[in-house]
Regions:
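HIT superfamily nucleotide-processing domains
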Residues: 1-162
Length: 162
């Protein structure tokens, strides 16, 4: 059973659809958009979700503001991005030992438009009815975290990505 607490979806939607890109604002160092960074290189960044529906829920994005998950990358850039996502997913698997790892790209031109991939490890033992889309929906609550627990997890994941 995954411990979850209610998530204020209305506040999240308002924040997600407000002007400005959350990833670009995070990269610019704006305090309201701070996330625990796992790893980064010249072109990519991996970080923990501030509202994780599953333990260790991480995101990976290009540093450049791209919006088309396929069309805005050239072949080399897309393959490099996918290699970075794979490294993050392997780190999630090494640290958290999930039953299954979900990879998906979400976002919309209406909000969270900066291309990013979600890397979510499904803990072992989650009943089938609570897996897949159900497990990813914050409407079912989010995993409670602290700044300290997120920082420690980011360090573990960073070590596993090396």
């Amino acid at each position: 059973m995954i411990e979850r607490v209610p998530h204020d979806l209305e506040a999240y939607v308002a924040r997600s659809t407000a002007p400005g890109c959350f990833i670009c604002r995070m990269l610019a160092g704006e305090p309201d958009f701070e996330h625990e960074i796992i790893a980064q290189d010249d072109a990519h960044i991996a970080f923990l979700s501030r509202w994780p529906p599953l333990p260790g829920y991480a995101l990976a994005a290009p540093k450049a503001h791209l919006e088309g998950v396929v069309r805005d990358f050239d072949d080399a850039g897309y393959l490099a991005m996918m290699a970075f996502v794979r490294r993050l997913a392997l780190a999630v698997e090494a640290v958290l030992g999930p039953e299954r790892t979900y990879l998906l790209s979400l976002g919309s031109r209406q909000g969270n438009s900066h291309v990013h991939w979600h890397v979510a490890g499904l803990p072992a033992g989650v009943p089938y009815r609570e897996q897949q889309f159900h497990a990813l929906m914050t409407e079912h609550g989010i995993v409670p975290t602290t700044r300290e627990s997120q920082a420690a997890l980011a360090r573990e994941l960073a070590a596993a990505m090396r």
